[in-house]
Amino acid sequence: MPDTLTALPQIEERELADAAALDAMLRGADRPFVLRGLVKDWPLVQAGLQSASAARAYIQQHAVERPFVVSVAAPDSDGRMFYDEAMQMNFRTTKGTLPTIFAKMEEGESQDEAPAIYLASIDMHDFFNGLHEANHVPLGARDPLASIWIGTKTRIAAHNDFPDNLACCAVGRRRFTLFPPDQFRNLYLGPIDNTPAGRAISMVDFQNPDFGAHPRFRDALAHAQVAELESGDALFIPSMWWHHVEGLEKFNVLVNYWWRDTPRYLGQPQDALNHAIMAIRDLPEADRAIWRDLFDYYVFEADERVTAHIPEKARSVLDRLTPESAGRLRAFLLRTLSR
């Protein structure tokens, strides 16, 4: 990694007294922080400290017998799961049994030129029996999605996620480079409808940044922070923070938790943005200005002016959403979008 990235400020490190303190620390948190040794006592972490083979054996003994989706990139990708020159994925996605996938990983550990192999965002409840129960972080009343990420040396381009994220390095080492949400203009984002994993990614090669092609990336770096996680360490990544992730060892395992403190019945903002691109962006400027005002009135600046003149029982989705009104709005959207 170039000196411009290794010299970045370190993400704040915090100390934790107990699980209750973690619950309080996460509540309303909007800045990233590292918790060293948070999961050091996990059986998975202890197995990984013995060897990569021991970690694989431990994971495999909990695996359900079903196909796993795996991504494989050629050795010359240098572990970067990205686009090729034609803007197609530079990796192939296939399915295989976990023993077969792990055998390929182990085979590559003795090779100078090995493919990058990556099992991304595997649901721990659906694909394993007892793995989550033996290796998890209590998160209070939250009901997170718990996923496991298993791979060789990999580089995952900077992207963001809507949920809050607690990322726990279980095996190997990982380097995270983080940027605040407002740095999207300086990260040179790629397509939103042709992505490696569903989120727009930075087109900048962090290992060899081309400042001629991406001059604003220097501005992004002025706001960046970095953390290198050892086995047992954890990192909190707030909602919408951009993160570039590197698996640094020949075998790496991450367990992460995604959650939102807002109700689950609320929709996905990315869906609204995508539809606005289709419906509003290419309108004449005068039309866009009208819709900008309407969005401000109904969404970004919504207050009592929107509903004060409407009888309370007739306000429907213009009032604060409930599970029932959100369901009606979702059904209405499905009908209109299917026309």
Regions found by a protein language model. Give the residues of each.
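N-terminal accessory scaffold of Fe(II)-dependent oxygenases
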Residues: 1-234, 244-339
